Amino acid sequence: MSTAVLDPARVGQGSGDATGPLAVRTDGLTKRFRSGQVAVDDLDLRVPRGAVYGFLGPNGSGKTTTIRMLLGLVRPTAGAAWLLDAPVPAASAAVLPRVGALVEGPAFHPYLSGRDNLARLEAADATADPRTADRRAGEALERVGLSAAADKRYRQYSLGMKQRLGLAAALLRPRDLLVLDEPTNGLDPQGTREVRHLVRELADAGTTVLVSSHLLAEIEQVCTHVGIMRTGRMVLQGDRSALVAHGAARLRVTTTAGTAGEAARVLTGLGLDEVRVDGVQVDALLGSVRPEDVSVALVRAGVGLAGLEVRSPSLEEIFVELTGEGFDVAR
């Protein structure tokens, strides 16, 4: 039984299909470490203005290194990058005040409170207005649900609280671009939902959000555009709806007890690929077969048909379809 393969050229592999103004752009961005390891390889990243761009990939795929290069924390080996039309790192000093960032493993003073840590960040920012610093710090802490712990020492914070403080630091002032590296790391399900809500709220207000994650299912719920990395290279990127539309649709047949095996034989006989039986349900790649033809064939074969559903693939299924690999989310 053959496996259907998604054509990468049709789904925006490499340079992607973004048109119009870009908030983030890289051309051939590459980072090779002294050890010889290539962490990012010839990356063409395209993040449209106003988008929520899910920058996805397994751990170790090059996402954090890319973000560090964009923010001037790591110097690229080759290639070029722009944030909000400004070349970086050449114009970083001018453009970074318009960019909020949460980079993996944010560092704060362990013996200062959350509120005092934000005050130190404000004092170090020459572009910040000291007259509104206290108010903005309070608003940022409230926005991330940390008001009750604002005066606790950072060293007493849990991992999730530390992550929330990092988010608060990125939100001290209105930003044109927000870069979030694994923002749900350490958060419980409620905290994860709050981050998704916050991202939507920021996008509705006109902020472009670049959010990296190894959790496809979480980011898929909020992003408008996606780019998926693997071993330092872009596997695909573009408008999320368009990517999903180009993926191979899957069919789920729900049978009455005792007829799932016969249903699987019928689907295989019709030429459907990746036929899998799970209890009374049978899943398969639909391919070019019409759902109505499947229904007729099942009924004729005496299969007890309780339901038939056609669904679009998830981003994880598209990744597997393109690469033949599972999306390893182990930390």
Feature map (PLM): residue ranges:
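ABC transporter nucleotide-binding domains
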Residues: 21-230, 236
